[in-house]
Amino acid sequence: MKKIIVALIFIPILAFACINQFAPAWVYDAAMQAARTAAGMQAHNIQVGEYNYAYLDSGEDENKPTIVFVHGFGAEKDNWPRMAAFLGGDYRLVAIDLLGHGESDKPRNVSYKISAQMQRLHRVIEAIGLPSFHMIGSSMGGHIAGMYAARLPAKVLSVTLLSNGGILSPVIADAWKAMAGGEPNPLIMHSVDDVDRFFDYVMVEKPFMTASIKAHFAKLSMAKRELNDYIFEFLRDDNFENLALELPNISAPVQIIWGENDRILHVSSIQVMAPLLDNEKVVILPNTGHGPMMERPQQTAEALDSFIKSL
């Protein structure tokens, strides 16, 4: 009997080790699907004009308010389910892959300026048929969400800006200092060696990743390298669109959430933003980097839930 018990314990461990080593894509996809399931979100596609968009949706329910999630540069809709799972089933949850990201179409002949991305996001939201919604955007997605709330306010009930882009912060973040010094963009990977550098910049507490999972993550990221290089040029220099000019035009309630240790977009951005907003709520998460929804999913969800329910 003792041998049987040992075998029952050892065999699943051995099986997982083999799968992890020889089928990391399966492990990666299984983890992603588990997060979606925990959040009650299912994958969908929708054709809007000439482009196909992928999105996650927990399902229409007229008795629940809707939250629209907008991811950042080089990211995707699946950055959100871990956080969304802590929202307790009180909302309809819709996370959209922006054009050029995730499983949505990836054209190279369009503009990826924030204003262009905002207009495309609006068309997707209209096509899905959302009557009104709360919006949360991270990084580049926060820049998009802020501009959306300022320019297309009719259906926006509130907006949460999560470590958002679009602000010329008083203190320059480490990533921008590095790029100014000639180092490569830490958000764009060129080899598996860049994975550790990526997480050093994005998180305080790095996720555990086996060598095979790390290699698979790098493979997925490197496949997007050329497109990400192209998109990034629309977010800087002459293409930069200053969100500070939009903030005074936001009429919906605004919440700002930032990781205290963000190395991509500095927390001092709040010093610029707060005077331009009325009655904004500010949450600074200690020991947190650029991706609070992944590094601190429960705390980020609780801040969002508390904010929405206070309105």
Specify the residue positions occupied by each region the protein language model found.
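Catalytic active-site module of serine/aspartate enzymes centered on a nucleophile-bearing elbow/loop
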Residues: 280, 287-311
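Flexible "cap/lid" loop of the alpha/beta hydrolase fold
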Residues: 150-151, 157-190
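Alpha/beta-hydrolase fold catalytic core
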Residues: 1-65, 91, 309-311
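Short beta-strand/loop motif that positions the catalytic acidic residue
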Residues: 250, 256-258
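Conserved alpha/beta-hydrolase catalytic His-Asp/Glu region
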Residues: 23-30, 170-178, 188-249
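Conserved HGGG/HGGXW glycine-rich cap/lid loop of the alpha/beta-hydrolase fold
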Residues: 57-103
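Acidic catalytic loop of the alpha/beta-hydrolase fold
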Residues: 261-265
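Active-site loop/oxyanion-hole signature of alpha/beta-hydrolase fold enzymes
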Residues: 49, 56-58, 95-136
